[in-house]
Amino acid sequence: MRRSSYLVLGLSVFLSLKTAMAQEVASRMVEDGGTGKYTAVMTTQGSLPTHTVFTPKDISKFGKKEKLPVIAWGNGACFNSPWEHVNFLSEVASHGFLVIAIGVMPKESGEQVKDRSTSTQLTDAIDWAIAQNRDKNSAYYQKIDVNKIAVSGMSCGGLQTLEVSSDPRVSTVVVCNSGIFKTPGNGRSNMPNLTKENLKKIHTPTLYLLGGEKDIAYANGMDDYQQINHVPVFVANMDVGHGGTYSQPHGGEFAKVATAWYKWQLKGDKQAGKLFTGQPAGLAANSNWTYEKKNMP
């Protein structure tokens, strides 16, 4: 009887270890893992092979006292891989966020994946995070703050973000180098075909990060800002064009501003929020940026 019990216990431990090991299929550090206090890694998860997960490397630090808010990310050109944004996404994750980007992990070399993705992959990311938080066999069990979720994206990924922004689980929206076309159908065939009416479905504080007048999405994004009057909205412009600063070390200025927004909206960090609050807002001290805001302190 005792031997049988030992065998059952041993099998249980083996299966638990096997499950934990199977969750992370591949892992790679981007740059130095970010400047935040949690060194980040880029991973492929066995239970979500359709996405790339940027996460603090050591998640044992998260649980009862501090949990991981969720950021679902849509890529530029609606690519099915976040290869254009890895520096930016790794940097954000290093500040204690679970960033789930649409698409497969970028290759270390060679031609990157340029297949197209769909907006539903953002909600797939949210579904996965919630499921992982309640799965006792998951490394993320009870470590995720499922009540603090952002949807975000760049260019075509920004349109994907706006398409799913009505999801009641969403806590904040971040739209980068994007905006809804004034004339429906003016985008490429693979882009979400939205109208300005979609903006009325936003129900959370919203941040737009644009690349100034040289950004091909500038007019659309600024028009979105003008038409959003029912929620807090902040639009910031840096004169860098449509490409932003995502590929710069640690994601450059766009990562700094976006991370501050995420910290404020998803972690309740009032110090980070000072970048956006006040008259003038703290961002006014940074000569790289101009901004407008409404329905905000």
Task: Tell where the protein language model's regions lie, with residue ranges.
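Bacterial N-terminal signal peptides
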Residues: V8-K18
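N-terminal cap/lid segment of alpha/beta-hydrolase-fold proteins
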Residues: Q23-E66
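Gly/Ser-rich "nucleophile elbow"/oxyanion-hole loop immediately N-terminal to the catalytic nucleophile
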Residues: S60-K67, E111-L159
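The feature captures the conserved acid-bearing segment of alpha/beta-hydrolase catalytic domains
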Residues: S171-Q248
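Alpha/beta-hydrolase-fold serine-hydrolase catalytic core, especially in secreted/extracellular enzymes
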Residues: V240-G243, Q248-P297
